[in-house]
């Protein structure tokens, strides 16, 4: 009787240990299977220009029409990875062949050129484009070549202070260069902004 009780206790002990090992194994499997894969954050599409104008203080506007040809625009970097999906433009005059360029700031090379038909004055035109991926914190520039533009300044004059954050975009400078050539502008000015060319990000 004693031997059979010992055998029974040994069997029970074996069963308990086996049960515990199986439970631990299943628990570990569940923990692996239950690891949640976090989907990438999707930000709503934004055109950062309006926020740039407000945050820069360049809220006084005058129209320049047929005022000489320039390549001009803004230097920016995204605060997150993302894509440009559209180019926007608005001018005080019609321009069927407005050239808008996205540049790699560091190499001063062209990443994308789009011709926008500004078919009506003082009207925001949006042109969908093949997506252009932008890398977080990398510097880019968007420029247009035009002899018409809105000249935006502070109401009491003065300069703005860069960088200027507008949503997920950080603007770091305004650049310009005279002429019709598609050439990277090298003159900087913090006392005004001329435009409008922008993008949807």
Identify the role of each PLM range.
Residues 1-11:
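N-terminal secretory signal peptides that target proteins for export/translocation
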Residues 19, 77, 130:
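Short, flexible, glycine/charge-rich loop motifs used to bind or transfer phosphoryl groups or to couple energy/partner
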Residues 95-170:
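Aromatic- and Gly/Pro-enriched, solvent-exposed loop/edge beta-strand patches characteristic
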Residues 12-19:
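Sec-dependent signal peptide recognition
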Residues 24-28:
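C-terminal motif of bacterial Sec signal peptides marking the signal peptidase cleavage site
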Residues 30-102, 148-201:
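Beta-sheet-rich sandwich/jelly-roll-like modules and their strand-loop junctions
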């Amino acid at each position: 009787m004693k031997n059979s009780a010992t055998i029974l206790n040994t069997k029970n002990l074996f069963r308990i240990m086996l049960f515990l090992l199986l439970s631990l194994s299943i628990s570990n499997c569940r923990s692996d299977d239950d690891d949640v894969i976090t989907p990438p954050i999707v930000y709503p599409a934004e055109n950062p220009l309006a926020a740039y104008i407000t945050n820069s203080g360049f809220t006084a506007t005058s129209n320049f029409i047929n005022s000489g040809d320039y390549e001009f625009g803004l230097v920016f970097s995204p605060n997150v990875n993302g894509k440009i999906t559209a180019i926007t433009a608005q001018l005080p005059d019609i321009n069927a062949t407005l050239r808008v360029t996205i540049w790699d700031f560091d190499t001063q090379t062209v990443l994308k050129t789009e011709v926008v038909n500004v078919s009506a004055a003082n009207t925001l035109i949006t042109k969908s484009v093949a997506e252009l991926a932008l890398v977080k914190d990398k510097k880019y520039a968007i420029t247009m070549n035009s002899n018409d533009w809105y000249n935006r300044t502070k109401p009491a004059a003065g300069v703005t202070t860069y960088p200027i954050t507008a949503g997920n975009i950080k603007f770091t400078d305004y650049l310009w260069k005279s002429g019709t050539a598609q050439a990277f502008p090298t003159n900087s000015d913090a006392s005004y902004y001329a435009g409008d060319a922008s993008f949807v990000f």
